[in-house]
């Protein structure tokens, strides 16, 4: 064991002196024993000359003093993996934080691993159903693909990701890993209790490094969750679901650490290594010929600006994007997905079939035409439109409302029972609205319902 001594502490960044020629390697984990007997983990980030390393702490550095002994573990941070982590809640270094005793796993993985080789990566395209109409119809998610949920503050990213966990984890028998990166502790607590109640906790591993943690933990916790998912993919050949909330906080933590490590900031004050860090994380989230990792990542958009370097860098790695819009949330339509801004690589007749593809395109054309007419309506009013355009507006408003849906995880707030809508019911409903079968029904009949049959029933009560 190589012993070093702390020489300087600047917030979450700690400098450690080692004897000459015994410097730890970059990314090696070092441990410091605190006075209360607990261990603090540091990760080596830079070599400063022959005898000093600069490290980032994975927990608060309160109580550390110069001269304290530091032990080099000789390896990167190792976290427990395997069946033993299911149903447990861990922190960035793999210690349990659920108060249910130690995790007795037989195997550990390093949080830093190389991405699979190109020849091992699977390229097949196949859709998986989420039960959420707007997603299944307009930006279908691919099995083994990467999906991003983009949105500003308070438009419903976390609620949507919770609903996806609820729908997918219940419908599919696979394992899920949830990484809470720099988000609200309250939401993590709610998720834990909801999973306990719904019974999906036994198939889920939860890893948290929330807002109150130092940047080192927030920067690395996504990698911890990913290593757990990789074990199930590579060693047990399973299809795994990986949920990350929020990938922006990963970038934000990197930017906090970057300045303290003495790097020059790049565009908008982000770290110069932004694209590399994002690439190293995203390149590991892939499906191989053995098993798949299907990932859903919430991505916060600072000030609703999609061109900000953090969300813009994430865009390039994704197969499908679900963009949440404040203007749609203001209309009271939830999930507040922007149907014209959201995209999917597999919305292709060869993958989803002609019926699905044609219906989706017809819905988009109708909504785009309505968007184009909105300026005319705002200036001249509805009366100036031709009869054909009035019909477009009426159907588009029905489609817009039919894209909303009550969520299981929001039952306590809406008072409405959640709905899971099968893909064929979704396609059938939108086809009928576009064909004009329901022109006589009031708009409100389509708001916050599941299938088209429910809309017809609701119309009878209005």
From Swiss-Prot:
Pfam families, A to Z: ATP-synt_ab (PF00006), ATP-synt_ab_N (PF02874), ATP-synt_VA_C (PF22919)
Record's subcellular location: Cell inner membrane
This protein's UniProt keywords: ATP synthesis, ATP-binding, Cell inner membrane, Cell membrane, CF(1), Hydrogen ion transport, Ion transport, Membrane, Nucleotide-binding, Translocase, Transport
CDD domains linked to this entry:
ATP-synt_F1_beta_C, ATP-synt_F1_beta_N, F1-ATPase_beta_CD
Gene Ontology CC:
plasma membrane; proton-transporting ATP synthase complex
Q: What class of enzyme is it?
A: translocase
Keyword Ion transport listed? yes
Q: Which SMART domains match?
A: AAA (SM00382)
Q: What is its EC number?
A: 7.1.2.2
- How does the record classify its membrane topology? Peripheral membrane protein
Q: Which family does it belong to?
A: Belongs to the ATPase alpha/beta chains family.
Q: What is its biological role?
A: Produces ATP from ADP in the presence of a proton gradient across the membrane. The catalytic sites are hosted primarily by the beta subunits.
Under what name is this protein listed?
A: ATP synthase subunit beta
Q: Which gene encodes it?
A: atpD
């Amino acid at each position: 064991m190589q012993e070093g001594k702390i020489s300087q502490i600047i917030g979450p960044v700690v400098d450690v002196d080692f004897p000459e020629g015994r410097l730890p390697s970059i990314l090696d984990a070092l441990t410091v024993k605190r006075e209360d007997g607990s261990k603090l983990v540091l990760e080596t980030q830079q070599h400063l000359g022959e005898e000093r390393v600069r490290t980032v702490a994975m927990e608060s550095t309160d109580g550390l003093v110069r001269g304290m002994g530091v032990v080099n573990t000789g390896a990167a941070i190792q976290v427990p993996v395997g069946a033993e982590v299911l149903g447990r809640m861990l922190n960035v270094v793999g210690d349990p934080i659920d108060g249910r005793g130690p995790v007795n796993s037989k195997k550990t993985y390093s949080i830093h691993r190389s991405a699979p080789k190109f020849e091992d990566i699977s390229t097949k395209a196949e859709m998986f159903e989420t039960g959420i109409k707007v997603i299944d119809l307009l930006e279908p998610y691919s099995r083994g693909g990467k999906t991003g949920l983009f949105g500003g503050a308070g438009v419903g990213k976390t609620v949507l990701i919770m609903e996806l966990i609820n729908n997918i984890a219940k419908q599919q028998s696979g394992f899920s890993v949830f990484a809470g990166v720099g988000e609200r502790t309250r939401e993590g607590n709610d998720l834990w209790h909801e999973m306990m109640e719904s019974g999906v906790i036994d198939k889920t591993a939860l890893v948290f490094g929330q807002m109150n943690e130092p940047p080192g933990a927030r920067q690395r916790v996504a990698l911890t969750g990913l290593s757990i998912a990789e074990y199930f993919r590579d060693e047990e050949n399973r299809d795994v679901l990986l949920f990350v909330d929020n990938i922006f906080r990963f970038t934000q933590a990197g930017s906090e650490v970057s300045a303290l490590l003495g790097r020059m900031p790049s565009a908008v004050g982000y770290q110069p290594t932004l694209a590399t860090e994002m690439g190293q994380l995203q390149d590991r989230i892939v499906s191989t010929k053995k098993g798949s990792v299907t990932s859903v990542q919430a991505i916060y958009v600072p000030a609703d600006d999609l061109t900000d370097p953090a969300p813009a860098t994430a865009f390039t790695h994704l197969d499908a994007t679900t963009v949440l819009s404040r203007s749609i949330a203001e209309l009271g339509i939830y999930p507040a997905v922007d149907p014209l801004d959201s995209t999917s690589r597999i919305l292709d007749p060869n993958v989803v079939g002609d019926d699905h593809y044609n219906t989706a395109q017809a819905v988009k054309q109708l909504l785009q035409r309505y968007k184009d007419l909105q300026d005319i309506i705002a200036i001249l009013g509805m009366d100036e439109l031709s009869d054909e355009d009035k019909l477009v507006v009426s159907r588009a408003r029905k489609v817009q409302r039919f894209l909303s849906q009550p969520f299981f995880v929001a039952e306590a707030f809406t008072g409405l029972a959640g709905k899971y809508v099968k893909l064929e019911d979704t396609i059938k409903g939108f086809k009928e609205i576009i064909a004009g079968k329901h022109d006589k029904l009031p708009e409100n009949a389509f708001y916050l319902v599941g299938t088209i049959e429910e809309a017809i029933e609701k119309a009878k009560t209005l």
